[in-house]
């Protein structure tokens, strides 16, 4: 639902989007959709009509074939399809019909950053919309051995918390960011964002380009490997507390 809201700039329920664990609630009418409706006007469609070259890279998760990025205003699609997590994991070869696998072990996150930077360079002399939607930090939680070693033990050495988990009602919730794998994923995403910003600087486009950075939900602090903590905010992904819905923008 949040991806839908970012793509169309309207409320997800107003647009018919719903994602829940149960479908038998009497308050949820059956017309809620799994695909982004063809009738919805996306940001890409508006920009394309205004003469912008439009590009999408990464996680789409807004419908099956027939409702992919190229069906909703994006002229180029690198990696966007049905699923919300990367099939095959974060290292090549991956199982993605819209992104050719690179050399064995290539980072998906860095590849998406490079694809976006390459698109910007190819279209530096015309207006463009580049929408980079990382699969990171969705599961599976994976990083390189080098990054794992870099962050392993840092939380303990820093004395961030004595109790790693707290029981919140019926949920066991992570209380400290001490997952070295998750930290490695964040660094990879930072590097990929850096590729894009560096390319804008190199081409002299930084002062004439609007860059927006946001997220679709809080980190997973319960279940799914308890990958991170959102303290001092309560809760995380899938919860209506601030840890699940308060995002950077």
Regions found by a protein language model. Give the residues of each.
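Short, structured active-site-proximal loop/turn typified by the sulfatase FGly-forming signature C/S-X-P-X-R
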Residues: 1-3, 51-55, 75-81
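Ser/Thr-centric signal marking residues that sit
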Residues: 1-2, 42, 54, 109, ...
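Long, well-ordered early-domain segments
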Residues: 4-61
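Active-site-proximal cap/lid insertion segments
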Residues: 9, 13-24, 60-62, 66-68, ...
